[in-house]
Amino acid sequence: MTRLVFCRKYQQEMEGLDFAPFPGAKGQEFFDNVSKQAWQEWLQHQTTLINEKRLNVFEPEAKKFLEEQREKFFNNDASVEKAEGWKPEA
């Protein structure tokens, strides 16, 4: 049976994640409030940001930047960073 959650990005009930994406309270929050579709879209966006901005994910500044961008992404904040020069496939 599919687990449904009220997705905070899409503001509707959608299929939930199969497991928390990371340990702790924040991981549980995403498990409870983010759809599988929204999480996959975030992973794609995060990968694009890492590649285009040449982020080293082991550096604290890069981790902080990605955490801030993740919150903006799931809150539909218009100030979420876009990778310059990147165009999604049509």
UniProtKB/Swiss-Prot annotation:
Gene3D superfamilies: Fe(II) trafficking protein YggX (1.10.3880.10). One of its GO terms (biological process) is cellular response to oxidative stress. GO terms for cellular component: cytosol. Keywords: Iron. One of its GO terms (molecular function) is iron ion binding. It comes from the Bacteria. InterPro entries: Fe_traffick_prot_YggX (IPR007457), Fe_traffick_prot_YggX_sf (IPR036766). Could be a mediator in iron transactions between iron acquisition and iron-requiring processes, such as synthesis and/or repair of Fe-S clusters in biosynthetic enzymes. Belongs to the Fe(2+)-trafficking protein family. NCBIfam families: PRK05408.1 (NF003817). This is Probable Fe(2+)-trafficking protein. It comes from Acinetobacter baylyi (strain ATCC 33305 / BD413 / ADP1).
